[in-house]
Amino acid sequence: MAVAENAGVKVDSSGQNLDNNNTAASATETTKPPCPDDDQSPKSDSSTPLTIDSTPETDDRINETAQKVQTLNGFSGNGERDNNGEIKDLADAFSKLNPMAQEFVPPSLARSQSGVLRNGLGFTNNFAAPPKLADGNDHFPRRRRSFGQGKRRMNKRTSLAQKDDVIRRTVYVSDIDQQVTEENLAGVFINCGQVVDCRVCGDPNSVLRFAFIEFTNEEGARAALSMSGTVLGFYPLKVLPSKTAIAPVNPTFLPRSEDEREMCVRTVYCTNIDKRITQIDLKGFFEMLCGEVHRLRLGDYHHQTRIAFVEFAMAESAIAALHCSGIVLGALPIRVSPSKTPVRPHFPRAEFK
């Protein structure tokens, strides 16, 4: 009967024939040649997971193997990085460095290294800091410097443009007679345009003088060039385009009140004074030719020649002193012009004997 024939068959819960499977497995083992690498452990494929019975011996063996692997990889038994492994990694990294290579410094820090960076490190409050924090501020210092440089460049360009404009409005006048004052010279050029400033200067290598005249516009300066050859005093003037602007007078030296303006009328400015001339000599020279000297200020000895401010008691004496320009005092001809600044008594007035 079919029932009797199937009675000896073993069937598991999945309906597979275990006896047939065992028979097939044993037949395969007898026919398959032994592999030298085979450790006689059961093999598993992708469909059947490998299961190992957990025993105290297998657990100890697995832990021992894992510790050996971690030790070889540079980790200690508790999973932390081993010092020997770190030293080995550092030694390998340093062995790859070029000892002849130059230190790299970013361009943004090159200008700020002096006095701040030492041996590639910056120090803030006695602590080593990264180079970007060496100045104590990490808020984009490079961008801040670039803004400041741009502002300075803009201010410099603006000042240069303004200076060039002033130069184009200025003429240079030479061969000016010693008797010609700034008022006389400005009156000659008033027909060319409105005069902003007129500055007469002495030439130590000549008995003549030169001057700079600034106009309100370039048209006045161009018209002034046609005045070259005009006789003023005893000599014809030479007028050329100026290469420099008139230096402004320090406003702190200008008169601050009506009394100081009245003092300027009575004061003359003297240049090209012999260094051997003393204050007493200069005072006696002007009092003999012009009148009483109220106050006198003589410059220092640090230059080749000296300057002086002479304030007279009367305005008529100051006008007379202008005619003394060119007279030899000591070994040099003295230059006299109206003063734009008063003589302020910063210290007690010197006693003249």
UniProtKB/Swiss-Prot annotation:
A motif (Bipartite nuclear localization signal) lies at residues 142-153. GO terms for molecular function: mRNA binding. Residues 169-244, 266-341 form the RRM domain. InterPro entries: CID8-like_RRM1, CID8-like_RRM2, Nucleotide-bd_a/b_plait_sf, PAM2_motif, RBD_domain_sf, RRM_dom. Expressed in cauline leaves, stems, rosette leaves, immature siliques and primary inflorescences. GO terms for cellular component: nucleus. A motif (PAM2-like) lies at residues 96-106. Residues 1-61, 128-159 are annotated as: Disordered. Residues 141-156 have a biased composition (Basic residues). The keyword Heme does not apply. Contains a PAM2-like motif, which seems to be involved in the binding to the PABC/CTC domain of PAB proteins. This is Polyadenylate-binding protein-interacting protein 10. It comes from Arabidopsis thaliana (Mouse-ear cress).
